[in-house]
Design a protein with these regions (language model features):
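Bacterial Sec-dependent N-terminal signal peptides
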Residues: 1-26
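N-terminal hydrophobic targeting/anchoring segments and the immediately downstream early-domain regions
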Residues: 20-131
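Second-shell residues forming the walls of enzyme active-site clefts
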Residues: 50, 87, 97-106, 110-112, ...
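Active-site mouth loops of central-metabolism enzymes
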Residues: 61-69, 136-146, 230-242
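Short glycine-enriched loops at secondary-structure junctions
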Residues: 64-67, 116-124, 164-174, 214-220
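Glycine-rich anion/phosphate-binding loops
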Residues: 93-97, 140-153, 192-195, 239-242
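A charged helix-plus-loop insertion that forms the helical arch/lid used to bind
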Residues: 131-142, 186-188
Length: 285
């Protein structure tokens, strides 16, 4: 069932190949994707897929936006051999990402998710794109409507280059000055303010037609270890977690936002395994 839902979202969101500077309607407009015809088409696609193809749809492959034959071969293999469900481009040139997006979509039998890690817009990864302040600065804005409009503008720019999912916003509460990886990526150290900014920005993204992904659940703000390199441990009781780390994520869930990224974090109070591989932490927290 979960695979069916994921593929349904993928097929409905990525309904066409998008090219630079195209003006497209919002891809997540309410009532547009949830139709009987669309569901029937998704069911038909699923019925024709092998188990390998269904598994491949659950993976997003990271590629560099480089116009090299080796890179194109990498993309070709990911799509044709492994049947991946989407791509995540790393840092590089805007024009290269657009060209490779169109190339990749032309290869895919099932339209691809094109994802992006743009916490403060395209300039976080792509050269020569509009620059916005980091989240720490945006967290000082008192009018949350501005965060909403900011999210819509980021969504507009994402759609112009064919991106349907942005791995943003950061929902971590930065309460540890020795944190080596979050700091200015966070909206600040006040859980309520962080939650308000997260919801406003993410709603702007989604109303603009781009799926938001709040991160890094259950909270990476009070760590002294970078989870890309090692396993941070959060030895806090449930009351502390509920009041700080988990608070913005719970508000995002209440707001009905579309996505959440699980961090590689060990939180003994929530489960014996790291959150990234703990169904209990993900499902029951």
């Amino acid at each position: 069932m979960k695979r069916n839902v994921l593929l349904f979202i993928s097929l409905c969101v990525v309904g066409c190949v998008m090219t630079y500077a195209q003006q497209m309607p919002g891809l997540l407009q309410k009532g547009k994707a949830d139709t009987q015809d669309c569901k029937a088409w998704v069911d038909e696609q699923l019925s024709e897929m092998s188990l390998k193809e269904k598994i491949g749809q659950l993976f997003i492959h990271t590629v560099a936006p480089l116009q090299t034959q080796r890179n194109k071969n990498n993309i070709y293999a990911a799509i044709k051999e492994y049947k991946v469900g989407g791509l995540l481009f790393s840092s590089g040139q805007l024009s290269n990402q657009v060209l490779l997006t169109n190339y990749a979509q032309s290869l895919a039998e099932v339209p691809l998710f094109i994802t992006f890690d743009g916490e403060w817009g395209l300039a976080m990864r792509l050269k020569g794109t509009p620059r916005f302040p980091r989240n720490r600065v945006l967290g000082c804005i008192q009018d949350n409507e501005l965060l909403y409009e900011y999210g819509k503008e980021v969504a507009r720019q994402c759609k112009e280059i064919g991106v349907q999912i942005n791995f943003a916003p950061v929902a971590d509460v930065d309460v540890n000055p020795r944190n080596p990886v979050i700091n200015t990526r966070s909206f600040g150290g006040d859980p309520r303010n962080v939650a308000q900014k997260v919801v406003a920005y993410a709603r702007g993204l989604e109303d603009g037609g781009v799926l938001s992904v709040c991160k890094h659940f259950p909270g990476h703000g009070d760590t002294e270890v970078d989870s890309h390199k090692a396993l941070p441990v959060l030895n806090f009781d449930r009351a502390r977690l509920d009041s700080i780390e988990l608070f913005p994520f719970k508000e995002a869930v209440k707001a009905g936002l579309g996505g959440m990224m699980v961090g590689h974090l060990e939180v003994p109070e929530l489960g014996k395994n790291p959150a990234s591989i703990s169904s209990h932490t993900v499902s029951y927290t």
